[in-house]
């Protein structure tokens, strides 16, 4: 395969691991290809979402008025943290009844999706190869990625949901006429003829602001997780260079273990930090939708 394409085995390895299990059966040709459905991203994101729902349901079911157990105490700590952040950012108490649980769900969901990156790079490819489900091209699971947040569709889909909520609360709080008026009258306020002259510029700036918020929210999560996944693949190549008990292979093997361990420990911080940032920006953007310029 490598010889046929002219690419090195290392390049072929990385390219293979970056292809999704989709309805095409091959790598999509362009970044934005709307007829492509990535089944692996749908499965793993859905599974992580169900796990979040189950854990929260289990915590609610086991909740007691007395001294909480470890699991209940851990969940209550996270809930209180998210609720405190929501109270400080979204001032409307009625809106917080939905926004706070949403932020909690987003936070936990992204943590679980990101945490899939900590699994060994070749764990599932090896399982598919041994079981015959992904041994060669054409097998059902020959292409398969388990990290949903490294699929641009997932973070951008979530950021699109946040954008729609910004529009929803902006219209709900300010009413349709007030929302549209603000698009044309802010951030540069004026009266009379000056207001008419500035209206197109205000509209353009507001549209750019909404687009920038949405794109940056999704791209930040995608970029960090894609880079982390790629580094794990590069580290895995060190282990794949083993040729026997010789100085070169032993050195690469030790480097593989050390680099993998150090990056995995550091990546735990990235997993949690990116989930927290996405949650906080979700609260900030929705909170801003309640306010006027």
Curated annotation (Swiss-Prot):
Signal peptide: none annotated. It comes from the Bacteria. This is ATP synthase subunit a. One of its GO terms (cellular component) is plasma membrane. The keyword Coiled coil does not apply. Disulfide bonds: none annotated. Belongs to the ATPase A chain family. One of its GO terms (biological process) is proton motive force-driven plasma membrane ATP synthesis. HAMAP family: ATP_synth_a_bact. The lineage of its organism: Bacteria, Pseudomonadati, Pseudomonadota, Betaproteobacteria, Burkholderiales. Pfam families: ATP-synt_A.
């Amino acid at each position: 395969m490598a010889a046929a394409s002219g690419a090195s085995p290392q390049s072929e390895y990385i390219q293979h691991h970056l292809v999704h299990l989709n309805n095409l059966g091959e790598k999509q040709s362009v970044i934005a290809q709307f007829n492509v459905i990535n089944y692996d991203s749908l499965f793993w994101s859905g599974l992580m979402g169900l796990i979040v729902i189950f854990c929260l349901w289990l915590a609610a079911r086991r909740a007691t008025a007395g001294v909480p157990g470890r699991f209940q105490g851990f969940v209550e700590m996270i809930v209180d943290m998210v609720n405190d952040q929501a109270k400080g950012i979204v001032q409307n108490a009625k809106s917080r009844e939905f926004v706070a649980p949403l932020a909690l769900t987003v936070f936990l969901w992204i943590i679980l999706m990101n945490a899939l990156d900590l699994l060994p790079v070749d764990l599932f490819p090896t399982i598919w190869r041994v079981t015959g489900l992904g041994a060669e091209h054409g097998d059902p699971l020959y292409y398969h990625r388990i990290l949903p947040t490294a699929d641009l569709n997932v973070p951008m889909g979530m950021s699109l949901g946040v954008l729609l909520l910004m529009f929803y609360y902006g219209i709900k709080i300010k009413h349709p006429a007030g929302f549209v008026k603000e698009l044309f009258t802010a951030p540069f306020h004026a009266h009379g003829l000056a207001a008419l002259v500035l209206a197109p510029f205000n509209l353009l700036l507001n549209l750019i602001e909404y687009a920038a918020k949405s794109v940056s929210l999704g791209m930040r999560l995608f970029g960090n997780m894609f880079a982390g996944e790629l580094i794990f693949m590069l580290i895995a190549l060190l282990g794949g260079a083993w040729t026997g008990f010789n100085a070169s292979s032993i050195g690469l093997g030790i480097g593989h273990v050390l680099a993998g361990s150090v990056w995995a420990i550091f990546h735990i911080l990235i997993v949690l930090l990116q989930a927290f940032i996405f949650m906080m920006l979700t609260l900030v953007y929705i909170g801003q939708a309640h306010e006027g310029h």
